[in-house]
C-alpha cells in the first residue's frame, strides 16, 4: 500500500502544484492531505475538474485530477474537445470501481467498471494502472511512464485499484472537517447584485448586440487574459479583436469558467476575463459555486444572455427563469451586475478589472442570427491558440497562426 504522504510527496517532487477533483473513497487520504496543503480544488463535477486543471496547465503549472471512474462520462467532453484538441497535458488519477470483478462492488459500478478501459482506448487516451499491491516504487515507475506522455502534450490516466493508496482516518476526520469549515467561513457576496428583472427583455427588444459590446470593451480586454466560450462568442471575439493571445474555446461547452478559474488561481497577478454564454453557463452552473468558494480576486465572469443556443439554430435556453446575478451572489461572488447597454458593460468591466473579485457581469443581448465571423481556427491552429494564450500569460508575444 502507498501511504498518503508518499503519494502526495511523489506529486510534489514532480512539480504538481494544482489538483482538482471530485472525491472517491479510494483517494480520501490524499485528498485530505492535498486540501490541508492548499493544493486541492473541489470541483462541482469531473469535467469541470479537468477544465480547471487544463487552465492551470496552460498557465505553465503541472496539474492533476482525482476522480472516480463513475464520473468518466462527465470527463468525456473536455477530454475529447479541450485537452486532446488543444494538446494540454493533465495527469488524471481515476479509481477503478467495479473492476476487475463487478460482483465485489456496488451494482451501480458494474457497467462503468467493465467499460472504463474500453472507453479510454476508444478515445486513444493513454492509461496506466496502479494495482492493489502497489508500492511506492511501483508508483514512481507509473509516474515515470506518465511523465513521458505528459511531455508529449497528452493527458494521461492512472487507473487506481482499491487498496492501492492509504485511506483517510474516516469521512469525518478532523483534517477534512477543519478544511471544509475554513472553506465556507468566508462571507458570501457583498450584496451587490443588481438583478434588474426587466433588463433582459429591454436589451433584447432594443437590439443590444454582442458584437457591439465586444467592440466597446475591446480596449479593456487587451490588459487581461481572456477565455471565450464555444460558439458565436469565440467567433465574434476573434473577428472583432483579431487577437492571437485569447483562448478561443471550440468545444468543451460550459467549461470556460472552470478553465479560467484554473488560470486565475495560478496566475493571481493577471486579470482573467471569461466571456460566457447563457446556455454554456447553465450547462455547468455548479462551477459558479466553485468560483465563489475559491474567490479569486482577479476573476471576471461575463455572461452574454440571449436566451438561446444561437450557433445551433437559436433554440431557447431556460435563462428566462434564471437570475444569474442572484445565483452568483448566493454562490459567493463579490459582485454581480446586469448591464443592458454597451456603456454600462464598459463601466462595469473597467471597475471589475481593478480586482476585488470574483465579479459577474450579465449582459442581455439580442439574437443575431448567423454569425458573419469565421472560427478562430480558420486562421490559427488549436496549438497556436494554446501557445498564444500561454505566451500572453508569460508576458510575451506569440507570432503563430496565419
Describe the function of each predicted region.
Residues 147, 341-354:
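A short, acidic, amphipathic alpha-helical segment used as a generic capping/interface helix at domain edges
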Residues 160, 275-278, 304, 363:
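Active-site flanking residues adjacent to catalytic metal/cofactor-binding acidic residues
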Residues 80, 284-305:
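A short alpha/beta connector and helix-capping loop motif
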Amino acid at each position: 500500500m502507498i501511504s498518503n504522504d508518499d503519494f502526495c510527496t511523489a506529486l510534489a517532487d514532480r512539480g504538481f502544484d494544482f489538483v482538482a477533483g471530485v472525491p472517491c473513497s479510494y483517494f480520501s487520504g490524499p485528498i485530505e492531505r492535498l486540501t490541508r496543503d492548499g493544493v486541492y480544488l473541489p470541483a462541482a463535477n469531473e469535467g469541470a475538474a479537468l477544465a480547471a486543471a487544463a487552465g492551470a496547465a496552460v498557465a505553465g503549472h503541472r496539474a492533476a485530477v482525482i476522480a472516480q471512474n463513475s464520473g468518466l462520462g462527465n470527463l468525456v467532453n473536455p477530454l475529447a474537445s479541450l485537452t486532446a484538441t488543444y494538446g494540454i497535458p493533465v495527469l488524471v488519477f481515476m479509481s477503478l470501481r467495479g473492476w476487475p470483478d463487478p460482483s465485489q462492488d456496488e451494482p451501480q459500478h458494474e457497467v462503468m467498471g467493465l467499460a472504463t478501459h474500453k472507453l479510454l482506448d476508444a478515445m486513444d487516451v493513454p492509461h496506466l494502472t496502479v494495482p492493489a499491491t502497489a508500492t511506492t516504487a511501483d508508483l514512481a515507475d507509473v509516474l515515470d511512464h506518465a511523465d513521458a506522455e505528459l511531455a508529449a502534450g497528452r493527458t494521461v490516466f492512472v487507473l487506481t485499484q482499491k487498496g492501492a493508496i492509504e485511506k483517510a482516518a474516516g469521512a469525518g476526520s478532523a483534517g477534512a472537517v477543519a478544511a471544509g469549515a475554513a472553506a465556507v467561513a468566508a462571507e458570501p457576496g457583498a450584496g451587490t447584485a443588481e438583478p434588474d428583472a426587466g433588463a433582459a427583455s429591454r436589451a433584447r427588444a432594443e437590439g443590444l448586440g454582442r458584437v457591439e459590446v465586444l467592440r466597446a470593451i475591446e480596449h479593456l480586454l487587451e490588459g487581461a487574459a481572456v477565455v471565450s466560450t464555444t460558439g458565436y462568442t469565440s467567433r465574434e471575439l476573434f473577428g472583432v479583436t483579431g487577437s492571437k493571445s485569447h483562448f478561443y474555446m471550440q468545444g468543451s461547452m460550459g467549461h470556460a469558467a472552470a478553465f479560467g478559474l484554473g488560470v486565475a488561481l495560478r496566475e493571481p497577478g493577471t486579470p482573467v476575463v471569461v466571456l460566457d454564454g447563457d446556455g454554456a453557463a447553465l450547462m455547468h452552473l455548479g462551477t459558479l459555486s466553485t468560483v465563489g468558494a475559491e474567490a479569486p480576486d482577479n476573476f471576471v465572469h461575463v455572461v452574454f444572455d440571449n436566451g438561446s443556443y444561437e450557433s445551433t439554430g437559436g433554440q431557447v435556453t431556460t435563462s428566462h427563469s434564471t437570475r444569474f446575478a442572484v445565483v452568483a451572489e448566493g454562490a459567493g461572488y463579490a459582485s454581480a451586475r446586469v448591464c443592458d447597454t454597451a456603456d454600462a458593460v464598459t463601466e462595469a468591466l473597467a471597475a471589475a478589472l481593478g480586482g476585488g473579485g470574483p465579479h459577474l457581469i450579465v449582459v442581455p443581448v439580442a439574437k443575431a442570427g448567423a454569425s458573419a465571423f469565421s472560427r478562430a481556427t480558420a486562421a490559427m491552429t488549436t496549438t497556436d491558440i494554446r501557445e498564444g494564450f500561454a505566451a500572453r500569460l508569460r508576458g510575451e508575444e506569440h507570432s503563430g497562426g496565419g
